[in-house]
Regions:
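N-terminal targeting signals for export/organelle localization
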Residues: 1-69, 202
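Thiol/disulfide oxidoreductase modules built on the thioredoxin-like
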Residues: 136-143, 148-202
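Short, ordered coil/turn segments that flank beta-strands lining enzyme active or ligand-binding pockets
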Residues: 19, 71-73, 172
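Structural microenvironment flanking redox-active thiols in thiol-disulfide oxidoreductases
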Residues: 100-139, 150-157
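Hydrophobic alpha-helical membrane segments, chiefly transmembrane helices and signal peptide h-regions
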Residues: 9-20, 87-90, 105-109, 113, ...
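A short beta-strand-turn-helix
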Residues: 58-60, 65-87
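Extracytoplasmic
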Residues: 61-63, 82-84, 114, 141, ...
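Short active-site neighborhood of thiol/selenol oxidoreductases, capturing the structured segment around
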Residues: 77-100, 106, 119
Length: 202
């Protein structure tokens, strides 16, 4: 490839990730963060719904074959085994400004579609205490569950850009039917995609 083509490719790659967080900040270290007593209090305050049950099934064209611990209460989740109902999987971090900006829209959509669409967050390269505190202070507060992904396993195994936010819409059969790169700008935008790709209307 010529030098000119390499330059164009680099510019296009840069533009594609303009709405994502370029990397995790050096001040955030992977791991649970804080002591267990403080973490237990934050779990109660955040009041997240339990993480969903999952099977050991691996669906072709589905989520990565990784198992991640629940951020709050509930079982570890085998991501490739999330079947049975349409699911919105949002990859986020409390340290990520675009993630912070869109989370209220996700929270509203999750509340509006509860019982029809499952929402699951994937908190990536974060500290559990920071993530739980963030969820509790979003307006409206986030109550849908998240799993804890300190090593970006979902992003890396799905060959996605290494920086959140990224949202995956997953059919009831477990197949990824849409990938949204960057932050949502309204609840309506997300609900329109849910209607289009998951066939669930608000």
């Amino acid at each position: 490839m010529s030098r000119r083509r390499l330059l164009v490719a680099a510019l296009l790659a840069s533009a594609a990730t303009a709405t994502a967080c370029a990397s995790s900040p050096s001040s955030v270290s992977p791991g649970p963060g804080g002591d267990q007593a403080s973490l237990a209090k934050l779990i109660v305050t955040a009041d997240l719904r339990p993480c969903p049950a999952s099977s050991t099934t691996v669906v072709a064209g589905g989520l990565p074959n990784v198992t991640l611990p629940c951020l709050g209460n509930g079982p570890a989740v085998h991501m490739a085994g999330l079947t049975g109902e349409p699911t919105v999987v949002n990859i986020w971090g409390s340290w990520c400004p675009p993630c912070q900006a869109e989370m209220a829209y996700l929270s509203r959509a999750a509340d509006a579609d509860r019982g029809r669409v499952r929402f699951l967050g994937v908190d990536t390269v974060d500290e559990a205490d920071s993530a739980l505190d963030f969820d509790a202070h979003v307006t409206p507060p986030v109550h849908f569950p998240s799993v804890f992904d300190v090593d970006r396993k979902v992003l890396l195994d799905a060959h996605l850009p290494p920086s959140p936010p990224v949202t995956l819409l997953v059919s009831a059969a477990g197949k990824v039917v849409h990938t949204e790169h960057g932050a949502y700008t309204s609840t309506a935008q997300l609900q329109a995609q849910i209607a289009t790709y998951l066939h669930v209307s608000a």
